[in-house]
Every structure is written in C-alpha cells, then in structure tokens.
C-alpha cells in the first residue's frame, strides 16, 4: 500500500463527504499523529482505535488529549501478536488514567460507537 493513502486527510475528506457515516480510524496515525488528533477533534463522526503502537510511544499531545478532548472517541486495540497483551495492558496502566476513563477506552466507547 502507498503510505499517502493512510494520511488523516483522507479520513477527513471521507468524514466531510459522508457526515452520517460513523468512521473508526485504526492505528495511531503515525507519522501524522497530530493531524489525526485534529481530524478526530474536528469531525464528530470520527472515532479512533489505537492498535499497533505501544502506549509508551504515544506522543505527549496524544496522551493529554486521550484524557481530555478525545476521551469519548478513543478505543483500545491490540494488533496482537505484534505487541503482547501483557505489555499493552502494563503500558496503558502506566499512563495513570482514572479507572472510569480506562473502562471507556477498553470497552465503553466501542460499545457506544459500534452500538453493541
């Protein structure tokens, strides 16, 4: 695949063209994490599943926005076996988020967004 097709601008355009479509962006958007944060904040129909990248590598801006402006849009993802579950759970805990936010990230947001 061509990496430019993974740029958050493609998701932004899709979300603008189909405002009633619920879109779940997968992976953290690297190397365009800041742009993906902007798309998730700007588009009400875009949520974000954070698989394929260990939380210990999340940039500070993403860590901050997960507990603030993005708290209702972030979903846990593993991409197992590329990253072991033990490591993922440990690194998520090490971020120090409150239990209520962790419940949102690990299941609450997905249940709401996906209608489960």
Task: List the predicted regions and their residue ranges.
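Catalytic pocket-lining loop regions of alpha/beta-barrel enzymes
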Residues: 1-75
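Conserved, mostly hydrophobic/aromatic
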Residues: 27, 48, 79, 102, ...
């Amino acid at each position: 695949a061509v990496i430019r097709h993974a740029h958050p601008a493609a998701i932004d355009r899709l979300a603008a063209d189909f405002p009633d479509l619920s879109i779940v962006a997968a992976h953290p958007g690297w190397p365009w994490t800041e742009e993906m944060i902007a798309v998730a904040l700007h588009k009400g129909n875009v949520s974000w599943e954070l698989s394929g990248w260990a939380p210990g590598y999340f940039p500070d801006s993403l860590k901050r926005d997960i507990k603030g402006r993005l708290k209702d849009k972030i979903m846990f993802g593993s991409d197992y076996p590329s990253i072991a579950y033990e490591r993922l759970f440990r690194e998520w805990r090490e971020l120090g988020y409150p239990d209520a936010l962790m419940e949102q990230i690990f299941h609450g947001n997905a249940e709401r967004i996906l209608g489960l």
